[in-house]
Amino acid sequence: MVTLPGTAAASTPTLMWSGAKRVNILCNVAGGPGIDHVALTQQLCREVKRLALKRSPLPIETIAIGDPAVLGADAVTLLVHASVARHGKDRLLAFNVRPYRTSSEQASVLFGAPPRAATISTYIARSPALDAALAAALSETLPWLARPVAPQPLKSRR
């Protein structure tokens, strides 16, 4: 058996976080007829904020589209883009979380946390499936929630 390093978390945060003094959360939920995307956007932002605040060394606020706080040089904004579709009696919420900072073009994140999905009821009310999906995405986005990854053993092809 050969042991190679797996996808490992960086030992230090990416340059995007250098000098950051606050975190903004900006959500946008799209949906078809009968989907209250405004209410779902607000609920999703509240859940992301609740999870992001765990062990956070920085203040975290939710903001709305058009808020000039996105342009703050000392802020990292988490862009949470989601889409909702009916899935039987439930709804399927697919989302992506990406950090954005205006002052860090050289340190921008090209490929961050992969898109995830979870079923939800009419409202995002602390759904265990959504909590797990959001926590996984945030652990790949926020340095203080990063989960250490150990080297993974791989079987050699002999």
Describe every region a protein language model picked out.
Residues 2-46, 147-158:
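A structural "domain/chain start" motif
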Residues 4-6, 11-15, 106-158:
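C-terminal/domain-edge helix-coil "capping" segments
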Residues 21-23, 46, 50, 86, ...:
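A generic structural micro-environment signature
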Residues 25-75:
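N-terminal segment of the mature soluble domain
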Residues 66-120, 124, 128:
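Surface-exposed short loop/turn segments
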